[in-house]
């Protein structure tokens, strides 16, 4: 039998909201496999679908810059929130976004070599690191292109802790910005249900079927139940199926259609997503300073 650690139990509880003993039993039942443990709990009707929320640890800001039919969304990291709220840092992030939007490099490495008034973007990051006293780094960016009939929508939440760049066909810029704001708030994974990978849909259907069986539902109504619950799943992950935050009586797709448009794409950056911050032991930190 696989040995289950307290950290595994905590992670499963954080992801599913179940109690400690239920989390441990699930992990024991599946030999410590986290994803299988989540499915196990869901099939027993004990947990909702776990949201894959990466711990946000790094500091910094994201921003959006538009240059004609091209736009860019960028994330620049610092070490502390104090620096991230510094006006000099905010100006640097905007400058980096503008330079990348104008030149549309292929990747971060190419972006760092872009020429600026002070040499290259990399030179500017080095200078900022020296002046501000913290490591400043360009983490990622994505260049997005649109057709003449499309509009970009840009939205920054909390000054750039979350940034969204959307592309809407047919509707105006205000509608595109509304879509970007919704994406910032709700965090969908896909534009519409057609974008959801078949394997993900099949897996969800399998889990929902087992859940219905474990509830003792008759076979003849299980299929109808699963179809209904699958629609709820699509509403969680697909933008078009979600209730629009500014008018819950409409889905996002219907809201945009009322403005004679449709959503083509979106990119959402949340600062630090996917980065694990090193956790310092406070006692050890104090001892290291007095040695």
UniProtKB/Swiss-Prot annotation:
An example Gene Ontology molecular-function term: translation elongation factor activity
The keyword Cytoplasm is annotated on this UniProt entry: yes
Gene3D superfamilies referenced in this protein's UniProt entry, alphabetically: 1.10.286.20, DNA helicase RuvA subunit, C-terminal domain (1.10.8.10), Elongation factor Ts, dimerisation domain (3.30.479.20)
Disulfides per UniProt: none
Family annotation (InterPro entries): EF-Ts_dimer_sf, Transl_elong_EFTs/EF1B, Transl_elong_EFTs/EF1B_dimer, Transl_elong_Ts_CS, UBA-like_sf
PROSITE patterns in alphabetical order: EF_TS_1, EF_TS_2
Main location: cytoplasm
Source species, domain of life: Bacteria
HAMAP family listed in its UniProt record: EF_Ts (MF_00050)
Task of the protein: Associates with the EF-Tu.GDP complex and induces the exchange of GDP to GTP. It remains bound to the aminoacyl-tRNA.EF-Tu.GTP complex up to the GTP hydrolysis stage on the ribosome.
Protein name: Elongation factor Ts
Organism of provenance: Ligilactobacillus salivarius (strain UCC118) (Lactobacillus salivarius)
């Amino acid at each position: 039998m696989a040995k289950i650690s307290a950290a595994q139990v905590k992670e499963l509880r954080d992801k599913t909201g179940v109690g400690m003993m239920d989390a441990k039993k699930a992990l024991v039942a599946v030999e410590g496999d986290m994803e299988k443990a989540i499915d196990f709990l869901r099939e027993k009707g004990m947990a909702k679908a776990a949201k894959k929320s990466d711990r946000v640890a790094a500091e910094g800001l994201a921003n959006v810059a538009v240059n004609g039919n091209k736009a860019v969304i960028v994330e620049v990291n610092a070490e502390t929130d104090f620096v991230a709220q510094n006006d000099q840092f905010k100006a640097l992030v905007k400058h980096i976004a503008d330079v990348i939007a104008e030149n549309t490099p292929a990747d971060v490495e190419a972006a760092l070599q872009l020429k600026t008034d002070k040499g290259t973007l990399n030179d500017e990051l080095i200078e900022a690191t020296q002046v501000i006293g913290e490591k400043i780094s360009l983490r990622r960016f994505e260049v997005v292109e649109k057709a003449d009939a499309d509009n970009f929508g840009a939205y920054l939440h909390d000054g750039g802790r979350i940034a969204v760049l959307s592309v809407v066909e047919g509707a105006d810029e205000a509608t595109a910005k509304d879509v970007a704001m919704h994406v910032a708030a709700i965090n969908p994974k896909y534009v519409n249900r057609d974008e959801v990978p078949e394997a993900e849909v099949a897996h969800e259907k399998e889990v929902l079927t087992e859940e219905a069986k474990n509830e003792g539902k008759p076979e003849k109504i299980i299929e109808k139940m699963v179809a209904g619950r699958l629609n709820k799943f699509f509403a969680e992950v697909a933008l078009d199926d979600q209730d629009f935050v500014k008018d819950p009586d409409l889905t996002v797709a219907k809201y945009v259609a009322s403005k004679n448009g449709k959503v083509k794409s979106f990119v959402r950056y949340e600062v630090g997503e996917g980065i694990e911050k090193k956790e310092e032991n406070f006692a050890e930190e104090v001892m290291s300073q007095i040695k």
